[in-house]
């Protein structure tokens, strides 16, 4: 029984599904997808649970959410192993994901008060108040790269605001989704407040097509995000928050410490086997001897990165990709770039057949025309050389995406120029592209999102503002507008 609907664990009536470790092939999870009828059942359960959950005080909802944080802490080791085994991540990285889930609770509570709390301004004849109300029933679509942390960034703020939820994890990480839901069950959520439906495309389409849905919160690919945007077009009454990918540029302009810059680049491009939406996809490197030396060192160090299984010792920097198919797609993308005229500096290699262990790849594309503006979701870095900083900014902005951008340079003036001209929601200076502050919004523009950033701003799309003018009594104004006559004279 792998679906959780209205407080009960039930068996899916859709297609059967098996999840294997992407490196070893070990069977980790087996179950069935939710069919359309069960998706509808989950929506009805969420709708029925909404009035009572929304009427609870924030303090009462917060008790349940904080209880969940405690359960995450007590079950950190077990959840770390589940995420690592299912995604192929090394143990150390899965542990950082669970830690981020725990920290998200306190951050979301603080953000709720700052972004969507209550305000009251006294007026001569009363007061002006601002409150925020939950939307109702929200669907949350989770990604596979952070199957615990990223859905958590939608679910926690939505529950705090008083919404009820139908959660569909990625079909590639059903085990992690189920494990997290079992902790929410232990936290004491009332039946129907949070519901779990497993499945792939058909389940997702049934969920996004529900008429009785008040909103949809999505993290995933641009292609799927665009499909959801089209599907919900003409329905302005539904909130839609899209956090999608990027074709992110990292500008290496001037380097004082080559190894430090190489470390930053590897953290930006290859952490999580390149499966972060903020990963550097395009390395923009200044022409000249220093750039040549940096590039040679980057290739040499990247060549030593050997992917390993989640529990290998010593622990590897990167593990496998989410699937053998995903790894093969990266290899295919590299082959296509090479066929276009790209110069391979480091060829990505599948270490074994029927596995997702893929070594990083680096290919120079300077002077190659018609390079696709697409996100290759894996450890493949494309390199372009430039002559002037103005040219670098033009190259950085030459994308339909707009998620992250970074600069390595000792010159503050150049960073200030980049801040003014960059088209990206995250712009870092001498920091990895994959780093983000928990007290800042997370999202991009263009094909990277629809102006609904998550993280610190997630509270914004989980509630709507209600403004009020209030007075505890009603009296006739001393001065009336022209044309109003409240005298006792009888009109003849």
Swiss-Prot record:
Chain sites annotated for binding NAD(+): 220-225
Pathway assigned to this chain's UniProt record: Amino-acid degradation; L-arginine degradation via AST pathway; L-glutamate and succinate from L-arginine: step 4/5
Pfam families registered for this protein in UniProt: Aldedh
EC number from the UniProt entry: 1.2.1.71
Keywords: Arginine metabolism, NAD, Oxidoreductase
InterPro entries registered for this protein in UniProt: Ald_DH/histidinol_DH, Ald_DH_C, Ald_DH_CS_CYS, Ald_DH_CS_GLU, Ald_DH_N, Aldehyde_DH_dom, SuccinylGlu_semiald_DH_AstD
GO MF annotation, one: succinylglutamate-semialdehyde dehydrogenase activity
Reactions mediated catalytically: N-succinyl-L-glutamate 5-semialdehyde + NAD(+) + H2O = N-succinyl-L-glutamate + NADH + 2 H(+)
Residues annotated as catalytic: 243, 277
One GO term of the biological process aspect: arginine catabolic process to succinate
Role noted for this protein: Catalyzes the NAD-dependent reduction of succinylglutamate semialdehyde into succinylglutamate.
HAMAP family in the cross-refs: Aldedh_AstD
Family statement: Belongs to the aldehyde dehydrogenase family. AstD subfamily.
Name of protein: N-succinylglutamate 5-semialdehyde dehydrogenase
Species per Swiss-Prot/TrEMBL record: Escherichia coli O139:H28 (strain E24377A / ETEC)
Gene name linked to the record: astD
């Amino acid at each position: 029984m792998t679906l959780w609907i209205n407080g009960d664990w039930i068996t899916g009536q859709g297609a059967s599904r098996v999840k294997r470790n992407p490196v070893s092939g070990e069977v980790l999870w087996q179950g069935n997808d939710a069919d359309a009828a069960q998706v509808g059942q989950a929506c009805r359960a969420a709708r029925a649970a909404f009035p009572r959950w929304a009427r609870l005080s924030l303090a009462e909802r917060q008790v349940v959410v904080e209880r969940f944080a405690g359960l995450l802490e007590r079950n950190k080791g077990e959840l770390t192993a589940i995420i690592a085994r299912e995604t192929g991540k090394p143990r150390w990285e899965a542990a950082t994901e669970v830690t981020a889930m725990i920290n998200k609770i306190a951050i979301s509570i603080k953000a709720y008060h700052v972004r969507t709390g209550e305000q009251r301004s006294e007026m001569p004849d009363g007061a002006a108040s601002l409150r925020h109300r939950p939307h109702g029933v929200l669907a949350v679509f989770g990604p596979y790269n952070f199957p615990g942390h990223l859905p958590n960034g939608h679910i926690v703020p939505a529950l705090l605001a008083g919404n009820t939820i139908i959660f569909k994890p990625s079909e590639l990480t059903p085990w992690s989704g189920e494990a997290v839901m079992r902790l929410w069950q232990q936290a004491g959520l009332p039946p129907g407040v949070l519901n779990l439906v497993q499945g792939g495309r058909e389940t997702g389409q049934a969920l996004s097509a529900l008429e009785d849905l008040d909103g949809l919160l999505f993290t995933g690919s641009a292609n799927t995000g665009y499909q959801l945007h089209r599907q919900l077009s003409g329905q302005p009454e539904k909130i839609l928050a899209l956090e999608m990918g990027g074709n992110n540029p990292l500008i290496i302009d001037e380097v004082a410490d080559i190894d430090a810059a190489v470390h930053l680049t590897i953290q930006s491009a290859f952490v999580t086997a390149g499966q972060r939406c903020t990963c550097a996809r395009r390395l923009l490197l200044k022409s000249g001897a220093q750039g040549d030396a940096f590039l040679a060192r980057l290739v040499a160090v990247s060549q030593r990165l050997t992917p390993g299984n989640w529990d290998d010792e010593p622990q590897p920097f990167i593990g496998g990709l989410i699937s053998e198919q995903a790894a093969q797609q990266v290899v295919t993308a590299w082959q296509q770039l090479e066929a276009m005229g790209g110069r391979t500096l480091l060829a990505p290699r599948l270490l074994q057949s029927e596995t997702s262990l893929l070594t990083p790849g680096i290919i120079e594309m300077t002077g190659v025309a018609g390079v696709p503006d697409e996100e290759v979701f894996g450890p493949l870095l494309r390199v372009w050389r430039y002559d002037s900083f103005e040219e670098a900014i033009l190259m950085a902005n030459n994308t339909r995406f707009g998620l992250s951008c970074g600069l390595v340079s000792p010159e503050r003036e150049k960073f200030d120029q980049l801040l003014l001209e960059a088209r990206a929601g995250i712009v870092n200076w001498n920091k990895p592209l994959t780093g983000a502050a928990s007290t800042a919004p997370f999202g991009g523009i263009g094909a990277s999102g629809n102006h609904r950033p998550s993280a610190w701003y997630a509270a914004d799309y989980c509630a709507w503002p209600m403004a009020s003018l209030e007075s505890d009594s009603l009296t006739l104004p001393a001065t009336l507008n022209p044309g109003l006559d409240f005298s006792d004279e009888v009109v003849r």
